[in-house]
Curated annotation (Swiss-Prot):
Cofactor: Zn(2+)
Residues that coordinate or bind Zn(2+) 1: 81, 142, 199
Database matches in Pfam families: M20_dimer (PF07687), Peptidase_M20 (PF01546)
Primary subcellular site in the record, as a coarse category: cytoplasm
Family (UniProt): Belongs to the peptidase M20B family.
Domain of life of the organism encoding this protein: Bacteria
Recorded name of the encoding gene: pepT
Sequence positions that bind Zn(2+) 2: 142, 177, 381
Cell compartment(s), UniProt: Cytoplasm
PROSITE patterns in the cross-refs: ARGE_DAPE_CPG2_1, ARGE_DAPE_CPG2_2
Gene Ontology biological process terms in this record: peptide catabolic process; proteolysis
InterPro entries cross-referenced by the UniProt entry: ArgE/DapE_CS, Bact_exopeptidase_dim_dom, Peptidase_M20, Peptidase_M20_dimer, Peptidase_M20B
Signal peptide: none
Protein name as annotated: Peptidase T
Amino acid sequence: MTYPNLLDRFLTYVKVNTRSDEHSTTTPSTQSQVDFATNVLIPEMKRVGLQNVYYLPNGFAIGTLPANDPSLTRKIGFISHMDTADFNAEGVNPQVIENYDGGVIELGNSGFKLDPADFKSLEKYPGQTLITTDGTTLLGADDKSGIAEIMTAIEYLTAHPEIKHCEIRVGFGPDEEIGVGANKFDAEDFDVDFAYTVDGGPLGELQYETFSAAGAELHFQGRNVHPGTAKGQMVNALQLAIDFHNQLPENDRPELTEGYQGFYHLMDVTGSVEEARASYIIRDFEKDAFEARKASMQSIADKMNEELGSNRVTLNLTDQYYNMKEVIEKDMTPITVAKAVMEDLGITPIIEPIRGGTDGSKISFMGIPTPNIFAGGENMHGRFEYVSLQTMERAVDTIIGIVAYKG
């Protein structure tokens, strides 16, 4: 189905800079997200028909569309995030490419281009309307496509009361891209049987498995002496960092793994002879494998300290989120419903693990099973990001189908 306000709504959203800031200590991490929620989203939530609309101190804008059929007793939530990734989001100037011809798309005057030779996903979209960047910013389809789709679904349901639906709760939240947005999510206040994050990629994505995730911060304490007289005295902290890294499995890196394979990812290393620091992220799907990866890092640190005769390696491990499969597989209703709706719409569900996490990873462990469904974005988090309007329309169809489902 086509929705006349969907494209303009999406274009309005992406032109607002809502980039999050991992170094901030506030919630949300940037004032622009507060402004976007209070000045743009909340007024529109009221206009499209949501009731009891409010903004919480945790950064979530919340609203409800009451059920219009007493036989549909479920309460279902839909959640998308306001923030965009760590890439330029100031001055987003989207290009709308109607009836895409399957060829190269020049991204404004930036000198960058979307070429099917480099981005095979473009081969799916001839004849469709694509929204791209101008090459100087990201687009923000992650996750403003999700926000626009949820808002459009509510607007359509309000305008078409003949479509019977259950109670719907909507939540637009902050700081998903920096991994803290759902930390303060109020599951008791949201009060639904299950929910969906509308934060996926291509048409048909339906995901209920995520990584389990941890962060590792390492400090290496060296001893700096003049290199000319260093033998037997110098301890080079940078060399310690190298030695630590070289003891990790050589092939367990993001660029060498796929599917259900986990990894260690060195994010940053800084320092000097005197001291050095390294930051890693640890990812795996199975709980035992996840715990084994953390234990392996601790074992390497302990072994190095034993060999050095002092505590020159300090490791701090912090769990970040867990594989939501552990919660959702106990009651697969949200997957069964979404899968049936997609199939009824002629959409082939793509049920694959997310090699990442969503807000649903945390919200599921708060008591609300929250799998992820497609929102349409491709090449997210950078200048090559784009989205198909037709895929966004199908996401709206899917949301409407889920809340009207009687199975």
